[in-house]
Amino acid sequence: MKKSLFLMGLFALFISCKGNVSQTDKPQPVNLILDTDLGPDYDDVGAMALMHALADSGQVNILATLSSNHDERVIPCIEVLNTYFNHPDIPVGAPKSEPGASLTTWHETKWTDELPANYPHHTAKTSDAPDALKVYRKILSEQPDTSVVICTIGFFSNLRDLLQSGADEYSDLSGKELVAKKVKRLVSMAGLFPEGKEFNVYCDVPASKVVAEEWPTEIVFSGFEIGNVILTGKKLVQMNVENSPVKDAYALCFAEGDPEGRMSWDHTAVLVAIKGYEPYFDVERGTFHVVDDEGTNNWVANPNGCLLYTSPSP
């Protein structure tokens, strides 16, 4: 009960200020794989908390929580959060391909050290986790056709590896064929719209290019500019809640310069992946391009495009 109350303090306004779903509507839960770079920024912690809150309300079935970041503290932090929300057995995985991004927190307070040091988890370091590619292929092969939503709030490294994978013990299909058969859509916190440079794109430019050009299903982008103006966490750190890794991550970092709240880049993608973009956002169809080796992206509107990007709903 306390966890639910404290999550309401962090997210209630964020997920309800633009509209409410009727209590009589009971859609099937979304089958979700979350792919995160948790570590460079702590908004991933809030995004995972939002995901777990929606799982507790029956709106999402969390199939896996994967790391796109090689940093050794990512998987322990993911497991801390899964365990805190009473889901310690959610499969995890980490990238094994090289080269890949390995990025620690850029905040002075090393919250990625504090969480594993103070809360239970199974895996000592990220490199001990199963191969994210194998986890993807195993889970996708077991799901009904067009039933899985993938939400990436990190780099595209794992998704590139998935697209370029071949048949294995889990499926005779290539990675691209497996995605086309099993995935309903990809929702990604990536890009700056209509053009610019954004962290999740430029940290692994080759992977971003592959996914932008070859992904066979619908992609919905929640760009940097969306979450950049949505601040969360202020009420959370003021609540009388103890022994919460979510509150700890926010409280540790707030002291460094976020007194009014932290930007919610990753929350927006999780929200769209689970609840859809309406009534929170409008979308425009088009094509997404990574136009240079520095990771600059642009967007070309096209009513027949299979990619969408979100913009605030009036």
Please place each PLM-identified region on the residue numbering:
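Bacterial Sec-dependent N-terminal signal peptides
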Residues: 1-27
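Conformational coupling and interaction surfaces
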Residues: 25-32, 50-60, 201-314
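Active-site histidine-anchored catalytic micro-motif
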Residues: 27-79, 121-229
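Alpha-helical substrate-recognition element adjacent to the catalytic core
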Residues: 80-83, 314
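Short, structured active-site "lid" loops
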Residues: 83-89
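Surface-exposed loop and adjacent secondary-structure segments within mature catalytic domains
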Residues: 90-119
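Short acidic, glycine/serine/threonine-rich loops at helix termini
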Residues: 103-106, 162-164, 233-234
